[in-house]
A protein has these predicted regions:
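N-terminal accessory/capping or targeting/presequence segment of soluble
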Residues: 1-80, 144, 200-203
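Fold-independent oxyanion-binding glycine-rich loops
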Residues: 17-18, 50, 97-99, 120-122, ...
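Short catalytic-site patches enriched in acidic/histidine residues
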Residues: 21-31, 121-126, 130-133, 161-206
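Short acidic-glycine loop/turn motifs at beta-strand connectors
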Residues: 39-44, 112-113, 189-191
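Flexible, acidic/His-enriched mid-domain "rim/lid" segments that flank
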Residues: 74-179
Length: 206
């Protein structure tokens, strides 16, 4: 990441809790209203960490923490983090995590003096598009689980069975394989026309 930032003239990238942070640092903080940010430059990295979560998160990384409490707010700790990384106000280009909360992004932008901004998809996102052999194997393994789950769902379909029962059959395949599906959508009859339908108790009709 730091090499990519250097090559593309990016002064810093700020990541919030979520997939980007997990990919770069293998850190998985709880995503809530308290600002938690991984900020990286071509030369270093550090984390703005709520004091409430610091002890737990210390088990996941040895990156420097700049902690803050609800009593003090994050601004002073963020300023210290920025100074420690040598980021100056008037920085030309900062990438922000396109998936993080807007108030987190605004906090960073304000602290850095309103620099030009872009999305971290241009750096971290590109890195995540490149898969190593282990990641490719994991994708194939998950695709195979998906296929088995679909077969189980089709096998469960018969008159009188509810959408939820069919979804449970598919979910059981994931659970048996040690996987956790994000969601299952089963829509009987006219419900099948709804692209984001919430699986319910409608029975399958002949």
């Amino acid at each position: 990441l730091q090499s990519m930032l250097r090559q593309n003239g990016v002064d810093a990238v700020a990541l919030g809790p979520g997939p980007h942070m997990a990919y770069i640092a293998d850190v998985h903080p709880h995503a809530d209203e308290r600002p938690c940010l991984l900020i990286a430059t071509p030369a270093g990295a550090a984390i703005l960490m709520p004091e409430l979560n610091a002890d737990e998160m210390r088990r996941q990384t040895d990156l420097p923490f700049f902690t803050w409490s609800d009593a003090t707010g994050p601004q002073t700790a963020l300023a210290a983090l920025i100074q420690s990384l040598g980021i100056e106000k008037g920085t030309k280009l900062v990438q922000v995590d396109e998936t993080m909360r807007a108030d987190f992004a605004l906090l960073v932008i304000e602290a850095l003096g309103q620099p030009k901004t872009a999305f971290a998809a241009e750096s971290v996102g590109r890195m995540r598009l490149s898969k190593d052999e282990a990641e490719k194997a994991e994708i194939l393994r998950n695709a195979e689980i998906d296929d088995r789950a679909m077969e189980a769902a089709f096998a469960a379909i018969r008159p009188g069975v509810t959408e939820r029962e069919i979804a449970d059959a598919a979910r059981a395949v994931f659970e048996e394989a040690g996987a956790t599906p994000l969601f299952t959508i089963v829509g009987a009859g006219g419900n099948g026309a709804f692209p984001h339908y919430a699986t319910g108790d409608q029975p399958v009709a002949v």
